[in-house]
Amino acid sequence: MNVGVCYADADRQLWLRMEMPDDSTVEQAIRYSGILERFPEIDLSVQKVGIFGKLVKLDAPVKEGDRIEIYRPITADPKTVRRRKIASDDDDDDD
């Protein structure tokens, strides 16, 4: 079956497509893709993974056409980011 594995850091993004056996798991696909060697900062024991934006466990089965995503840790408080965006939008309205 054909699946993809994707990851993005602050500077680059990578989406790898590959053929996997039908009974493969998310973790097997990630390891097989070689993405862990290209991004050594990825720590699967800490970082969350998903399929098409939905969180899944590493032992979740993959299906034909799945896009497996490795998520980076949040580095900013989402509430703070939202407040800054709202404040910025309000400033733009004054023009």
Curated annotation (Swiss-Prot):
Pfam families: Ub-RnfH (PF03658). It comes from the Bacteria. InterPro entries: Mopterin_synth/thiamin_S_b, RnfH, RnfH_sf. PANTHER family: UPF0125 PROTEIN RATB. Belongs to the UPF0125 (RnfH) family. NCBIfam families: PRK01777.1. This is Protein RnfH. It comes from Methylococcus capsulatus (strain ATCC 33009 / NCIMB 11132 / Bath). The gene is rnfH.
